[in-house]
Swiss-Prot record:
Encoding gene, per UniProt annotation: gpdA2
More details: H.volcanii contains 2 glpABC operons, one located on the main chromosome and the other on megaplasmid pHV4.
Localization in the cell: Cell membrane
Role noted for this protein: Conversion of glycerol 3-phosphate to dihydroxyacetone phosphate. Functional analog of glpA1 required for the basal levels of glycerol-3-phosphate dehydrogenase activity, but not expressed during standard growth on glycerol or when glpA1 is knockout.
Protein family membership: Belongs to the FAD-dependent glycerol-3-phosphate dehydrogenase family.
Pathway connected to this protein: Polyol metabolism; glycerol degradation via glycerol kinase pathway; glycerone phosphate from sn-glycerol 3-phosphate (anaerobic route): step 1/1
Name the record gives this protein: Anaerobic glycerol-3-phosphate dehydrogenase subunit A2
Binding site for FAD: 4-32
Membrane topology: Peripheral membrane protein
InterPro entries reported for this sequence: BFD-like_2Fe2S-bd_dom, BFD-like_2Fe2S-bd_dom_sf, FAD-dep_OxRdtase, FAD/NAD-bd_sf, G3P_DH_FAD-dep, G3P_DH_GlpA_su
GO molecular function: flavin adenine dinucleotide binding; FMN binding; glycerol-3-phosphate dehydrogenase (quinone) activity
Substrates-to-products reaction catalysed: a quinone + sn-glycerol 3-phosphate = dihydroxyacetone phosphate + a quinol
UniProt EC number: 1.1.5.3
């Protein structure tokens, strides 16, 4: 007998759960109110934890992280960059805590190497001279977008249905059990032509909430009280990659003391401040300034780096002992599977909460095991053994460089993104120009993404990184829109470009000084005037002097980052 399960949430845990259940033979439907990665997954800094960060304060989480770090290297190699990590001790930092960190890593089976400050600077020349010594650990960088999409693709390959832009507006509760979900369409997706505002009900034998920070709101639809310990964090993106190693400050408790190299950029962050509503919290300039100031204590060059955007995310923390602390930093990073039949008397419903991106697969396995136990299904988990799509043979990608007429850097970037899917995606019968020069994204990759998500350029961005470089879509958004025109028409293409451009603008608002301000005004010239997107730009008496914004570094005002 095939049981039906609805998974709510299109982040890493949700898509991982959909994959796991589909591989065990369940009839799975995943619903997500926006794009995949719309919530916490798409707003992390992509840190593949070794567990060392928690080796003193949260050993259970540390052990989970190291174990899953090894698993993800086996099944998702094309989503990971093996940067390694350094926990650096600066002058004045605690010797005692450094030794406790080493001992904690040993207890949690986390490999370490102690190196001198001189050796640390040899490996990473931009580190401050104040670094006295450091602990090397097997941290890394993981692409959360690629990882999430790969899980969704695998779920579909095993028969699952992925419904994006489908917001759950109610849980169907009958006779004391959750029997399905009611969704409201936010617009058409690749699997449904439903119009915005349409509603649809998906019946299910079991419903899993993998909604992270939104789990409390979802549970309330079934009359369940689930209190989350949500916290926010700001992250800042530089325009170039100053480092090749993940850098952490070796302190007992820190905010904003992590620097992560990712693709062509470096990410700084994040602070840890409690919020009540995951959809409504302040995003403030002082947070951006603080991230830059803290990071520059370890890597001074960051203070003068060009920042291209800032973004905020919320942590889906769960405290099994509510009100035990008011400091989010004290809340465990462990995860929990909450059986609402046992906990709240509402059957057919479970929430998976807490955890980290690094442990998403284990979280998915645990909640899938729970579903199997409740429904009497005896099928083992295989997600720790079966590689995700694109991960089977990443090394083979180099062979496609000449075959598909790609210049070396573009071939490398395309290969990293596509994994072993490169041959099927890049083998086209027409020219394959680069549409996004900043991130080296080709037409073939863009068209492949459009085939997956339809006329949704933000969905294309998540799958390819197009528009995520220095220009933030200024030079490529219209090219991406042009790829929609043949099948979707001019109006749809224009709307898609506008949505992409607005999303890109949102992240730039807190990074508008110096060279990035010049870039923003150049984008305004191109799109608002030359392309006439702002048809009324000459309606008033204002006369914008664009050259005034072209001062580069010398134009940075005193106080710099918005002080």
């Amino acid at each position: 007998m095939s049981y039906s399960v609805v998974v709510i949430g299109g982040g890493a845990t949700g898509t991982g759960t959909a994959r796991d259940l589909a591989m065990r033979g369940f009839d799975v439907t995943l619903v997500e109110r926006g794009n995949l990665t719309e919530g916490t997954t798409g707003r992390t800094h992509g840190h593949l934890h070794s567990g060392a960060r928690y080796a003193v304060s949260d050993k259970e989480s540390a052990v989970d992280c190291m174990r899953e770090n090894r698993v993800l290297h086996r099944i998702a190699g094309h989503c990971i960059e093996d940067t390694g990590g350094l926990f650096v001790q600066l002058e004045g930092d605690s010797d005692d805590y450094f030794e406790r960190k080493l001992a904690g890593c040993a207890e949690c089976d986390i490999p370490t190497e102690v190196i001198s400050g001189e050796e640390a600077r040899r490996r990473e020349p931009y580190l401050t001279d104040a670094v006295e010594r450091a602990i090397w650990v097997p941290d890394g960088a993981v692409d959360p977008f690629r990882l999430c999409v790969a899980n969704a693709a695998s779920a579909v390959e095993h028969g699952a249905r992925i419904e994006t832009h489908a917001e759950v507006v109610d849980l169907v509760v009958e006779g004391g059990r959750v029997a399905g979900v009611e969704v409201k369409r936010q617009g058409p997706n690749h699997h449904s032509e439903g119009a915005a505002g349409d509603t649809e009900t998906f019946e299910a034998d079991y419903v899993v909430s993998a909604t992270g920070a939104w789990a409390g709101q979802l549970a309330a639809m079934a009359g369940v009280d689930l209190e989350m310990a949500i916290s926010k964090g700001a992250m800042v993106v530089t325009n170039v990659r100053q480092l090749d190693t993940v850098i952490n400050r070796c302190l007992p408790k820190g905010e904003g003391d992590t620097i992560i190299p990712h693709e062509t950029t470096v990410l700084l962050g994040a602070n840890d401040d409690p919020v009540d509503d995951p959809d409504d919290y302040p995003e403030e300039q002082w947070e951006v300034d603080m991230m830059i100031d803290i990071a520059s204590e370890m890597v001074p060059v960051v203070a003068d780096a060009r920042m291209i955007r800032a973004y905020w995310g919320v942590r889906p923390l769960y405290d099994p002992n509510p009100k035990s602390t008011t400091d989010p930093g004290d809340v465990t990073r462990n995860y929990f599977v909450l059986d609402h039949a046992e906990r709240d008397g509402v059957a057919g419903f479970a929430s998976v909460v807490g955890g980290k991106l690094t442990t998403y697969r284990e979280m998915a396995e645990s909640v899938s095991d729970h579903v199997c136990e409740v429904l009497g299904v005896e099928e083992p988990c295989r997600t720790d053994e079966v590689p995700l799509p694109g991960s089977a043979d990443p090394s083979a990608l180099d062979e496609y460089m000449d075959e598909f007429d790609l210049r070396s850097p573009i071939a490398r970037r395309s290969g990293q993104r596509l994994g072993d899917r490169a041959p099927e995606v890049l083998d086209i019968d027409e020219p394959n120009p680069t549409l996004c020069e900043c991130e080296a994204v080709t037409r073939a990759e863009v068209r492949d993404a459009i085939d997956q998500v339809g006329a949704d350029l933000n969905g294309v961005r998540l799958r390819t990184r197009a528009s995520m470089g220095n220009c933030q879509g200024g030079f490529c958004s219209h090219r991406l829109g042009a790829e929609l025109y043949p099948d979707h028409g001019a109006e749809v293409a224009r709307d898609a470009v506008d949505e992409l451009y607005q999303e890109r603008w949102k992240g730039q608002r807190h990074a508008l000084w110096g060279e990035q301000l010049s870039q923003a005004m150049l984008n305004a010239m191109l799109h608002a005037t030359t392309m006439n997107h702002d048809a009324n730009h000459v309606a008033g008496d204002e006369n914008i002097e664009y050259r005034a914004f072209d001062g580069g570094r010398t134009a940075v005002p005193e106080g710099s980052h918005g002080d």
